[in-house]
Structures are given as structure tokens and as C-alpha cells.
Curated annotation (Swiss-Prot):
Active-site residues from the entry: T215
Sites marked Involved in the stabilization of negative charge on the oxyanion by the formation of the oxyanion hole: T136, G137
Protein name from the UniProt record: Arginine biosynthesis bifunctional protein ArgJ, mitochondrial
Membership in a protein family: Belongs to the ArgJ family.
Site (Cleavage): A214, T215
Targeting signal (transit peptide) range: 1-8
PTM characteristics: The alpha and beta chains are autoproteolytically processed from a single precursor protein within the mitochondrion.
Designated gene of the protein: ARG7
GO BP term, pick one: ornithine biosynthetic process
UniProt keyword Cell cycle, yes or no: no
EC number: 2.3.1.35, 2.3.1.1
Annotated binding of substrate, by residue: T177, K204, T215, E301, N436, S441
Pfam families referenced in this protein's UniProt entry, alphabetically: ArgJ
Lineage, top ranks: Eukaryota, Fungi, Dikarya, Ascomycota, Saccharomycotina
Length: 441
């Protein structure tokens, strides 16, 4: 059945994503300040340089990071990895980030430029090996270091640091490229021990997003004291279930970095892997990272739909994730979602070619596939395949209603175990081609 043009157009009405997803206020972790400026790297003169600074001196800070797996790792990635390794995740007190130029595939000169950015900030804060650097933007072009250097000096020289809401929001804006809205999330948490702490996160990304991260930068800061090894374990666990579970277009960038700083401004005992609160904090960080990662998908270039791919009852978490990833990255699935076409064959095809670690994870006679409505309308579930048998007489009207939603779920029940994984993806539209065809201009 062909979808009516009226229904198709209704689902593609512009969503005011800025109003929906950008907070109006917030409270932020103690002991952090942020600064920002428009250095002139971006042609349109918008904000393109930011600094996150730990001002708490009551105890040493800790840091952790997860970097891109792309073989062409950008200069900021290689440089920041070296800083973290040398520091062993301790006493990292600043992050400097620019947008508009990725400083990627720029050779030795690019490495020197990244190091200059680090050295400039280290000099301003009077510390050595205490700064991480990140860049995002066009690949293959050198940074305009005169503008970057002037911008860093301006941020520090004019005391452009603040801890208020607008300061944090402007830093979130300074890392945007093709993003249609800045991604800023902040939340307070309470542990069973009674300790209260805050997590604040920022991210950028709208295209080149796929598992193992893509053109994606993410920062999470907290005032909770966390031992460096415990922090790295938390962030790795959280990233595996958040930023590595999103897909926009299946492209993996050279600059991906997710980092987390813990400054210990809260007066409580440091969390380590043996602490009674460790597992609770790990889960809270994971849920927080998922919220932040989902904003990246919601801002997918040209997207009109946010789609949760839920794979459950698998033998292994890893295989559940592989299947969810395969569905999420399928261009045919994504274009069918855009066209509101209930083509479940494309979903089964993506499941079938998924490169599973254990072939026993998939039994074609046990699989169930459904579309799930997220707007509380009934019937909530529309079964497409039941115990391996295609439902040939599905309710096409109901299918059209579900696929017209801005948010929907694809549910896959493998029926072979008890493990589950989620991915978040979006549809693929004509607008995606337009945005990326004009990117460098």
C-alpha cells in the first residue's frame, strides 16, 4: 500500500528541536568554570572555541576517555591519548576544543598545532600535562593557529569564564558544526550513602555517526571524587551502552572523543571499584550518557524520526548489540522508515547478515519482529514476524500510523536467551544529501 502524500508530509513537518531539547536552566558541578569565544575559524563568525576548567584545588582531579577506532586518528586524538597515558588519568584540569576544523590528516604540523593548543592552556593555568585538546570540523585542513592562539588568550585574558547556565550553553554551542541545536544535559543524583552530586554533559554531532563513535565529541564532568581507574571503567562501560549504540549514517570519523573529568569538589570519600556506591554511580553515568547520546541521534542530519531498536532475549549481550547495530546502520531500513514503508523484509535482511559471534544466537524459527508505538495509542505493538512466521496480513493503516510518529521502536525478540541491547538511530532523508553535499561551502 502506498502512503498518502498528506500523511507523509505531516510526519515531515519541521520540529523545533531547539525548543524541545535545549534546557532553559540548570545546576552544574561545583568547581568547574567554562569559557568560550568566536576565534574566526568558522566562516560565519559563530562561537568556535571553548575551554572547560577545573578550579577545585581541594584534591587532585581524575580523567578518563574513549577515543575513535578509525585508523586515521586525528592529531588531537593522538595528543590527548598521550597526555592521559602520561598523567595516568590524574591531574587533568582543562579541556580546550575548537570547531570548524578537525585538524585531521594534517601530519606532523597538525600534531604540533594540537600541542600548541595544549601548551597555551597549560601555561595559562600554570600546570604541565594537564590539558586535553579536541577538534571537530572539516578533515584535511590545518588549523588557523593565529586565530586559535588569539582566541585562547582572549578567553583567559578577558576572564571570560563562568559557571552559570549561559556560560555552559555557549560552550555547548561552540563545539557545534552541522548541529541544529547545542546538546547540554545536567542532572543531580543521590547515592544510597546520601551523597549528592552533579553530572553535566555536552556533545556535538549530527552526521558521521555510527558505532565505535563517529564525528562525535562528548564531555562529562562531575564534582564527585572518583579514582582514575574506576572512572575509566565507568566511562568505558557507559560508552559501550550509549555513544557506541547510536547511528545516523554509518560513517566513523577520525576525531571521536568522549572524556570525563571528576574534580572531587564534593566532600566525600573517593569512589573506587571496591566502593559500595561504585555500581550505582556506574549505572547513573551510563543512563546519563545515554540521554546525551540520544540527543545526537535526534539531531541526525536531515532526520525526521528517532528510532529505538530494541533487541531482547539474546544469548549474549554482544550479539544482541551486533544485530541492533546491523538494523540501525541499514540504509534500506533507514530509507523505508523515512518513506513510512512497513517493509519488514529489510529488517530481517539486516538481521540475517549481522556478523554474530555465536551463530546459536539467531534461530530463524524463534524470532519475533514488531513495530512499537511510543505515543500510548493502541494497539501499541504491531507484530510483523511471529516465531519466524511473517504476518502477511498486517494492518497497513496501523503500520502507517506508527511509522508516521516522530518517535517509534523496532522490537526484535530472538527467543534464544535473556540478554538485551538497545540502539538509537534515525531515518535517512533527501535533506541529508543536501547538507553533506554543501558541507565545505
Amino acid at each position: 500500500m502506498r502512503i498518502s502524500s498528506t500523511l507523509l508530509q505531516r510526519s515531515k513537518q519541521l520540529i523545533d528541536k531547539y525548543a524541545l531539547y535545549v534546557p532553559k536552566t540548570g545546576s552544574f558541578p561545583k568547581g568547574f568554570e567554562v569559557g568560550y569565544t568566536a576565534s574566526g575559524v568558522k566562516k560565519n563568525g559563530s562561537l568556535d572555541l571553548g575551554v572547560i576548567l577545573n578550579t577545585n584545588k581541594s584534591r587532585p582531579s581524575t580523567a578518563a576517555a574513549v577515543f575513535t577506532t578509525n585508523k586515521f586518528k586525528a592529531a588531537p586524538v593522538l595528543t590527548s591519548k598521550k597526555v592521559l597515558e602520561t598523567a595516568r588519568g590524574k591531574n587533568i584540569n582543562a579541556i580546550v576544543v575548537n570547531s570548524g576544523c578537525a585538524n585531521s590528516v594534517t601530519g606532523d604540523l597538525g600534531m604540533k598545532d594540537a600541542q600548541v593548543m595544549i601548551d597555551l592552556v597549560n601555561d595559562k593555568i600554570g600546570q604541565k600535562n594537564s590539558t586535553l585538546v579536541m577538534s571537530t570540523g572539516v578533515i584535511g585542513q590545518r588549523l588557523q593557529m593565529d586565530k586559535i592562539s588569539t582566541g585562547i588568550n582572549k578567553i583567559f585574558g578577558e576572564e571570560k569564564f563562568g559557571s552559570d547556565f549561559n556560560s555552559w550553553l555557549n560552550v555547548a554551542k561552540s563545539i557545534c558544526t552541522t548541529d541544529t541545536f547545542p546538546k547540554l544535559v545536567t542532572s543531580r543524583f543521590k547515592l544510597p550513602s546520601g551523597t549528592e552530586y552533579t553530572l553535566t554533559g555536552m556533545a556535538k554531532g549530527a552526521g558521521m555517526i555510527c558505532p565505535n563513535m563517529a564525528t562525535l565529541l562528548g564531555f562529562i564532568v562531575t564534582d564527585l571524587p572518583i579514582e582514575s581507574k574506576a572512572l575509566q571503567k565507568m566511562l568505558t562501560f557507559a560508552t559501550t551502552r550509549s555513544f557506541n549504540c547510536i547511528s545516523v549514517d554509518g560513517d566513523m570519523s577520525t576525531n571521536d572523543t568522549i572524556c570525563m573529568l571528576a574534580n572531587g569538589a564534593i566532600d566525600t570519600k573517593e569512589i573506587n571499584e571496591d566502593s559500595k556506591d561504585f555500581e550505582q554511580v556506574k549505572l547513573q553515568v551510563t543512563e546519563f550518557a545515554q540521554r546525551l547520546a540520544q540527543l545526537v541521534v535526534r539531531d541526525g542530519e536531515g532526520s525526521t524520526k528517532f528510532v529505538t531498536v530494541n533487541v531482547k532475549n539474546a544469548l549474549h549481550f554482544e550479539d544482541a548489540k551486533i544485530i541492533a547495530e546491523s538494523i540501525s546502520n541499514s540504509m534500506l531500513v533507514k530509507t523505508a522508515l523515512y518513506g513510512q514503508d512497513a517493509n519488514w523484509g529489510r529488517i530481517l535482511c539486516a538481521i540475517g547478515y549481522a556478523k554474530l559471534n555465536d551463530l546459536k544466537s539467531l534461530d530463524v524459527n524463534k524470532i519475533n519482529v514488531s513495530f512499537i508505538a511510543t505515543d500510548n495509542s493502541e494497539p501499541r505493538e504491531l507484530k510483523l514476524v511471529a516465531n519466524g512466521v511473517p504476518q502477511l496480513e498486517i494492518d497497513e493503516t496501523r503500520a502507517s500510523e506508527i511509522l508516521a510518529l516522530n518517535d517509534l521502536e523496532v522490537s526484535v525478540d530472538l527467543g534464544t536467551g535473556d540478554q538485551a541491547a538497545q540502539f538509537w538511530t534515525c531515518d535517512l532523508s533527501h535533506e541529508y544529501v543536501t547538507i553533506n553535499g554543501d558541507y565545505r561551502s
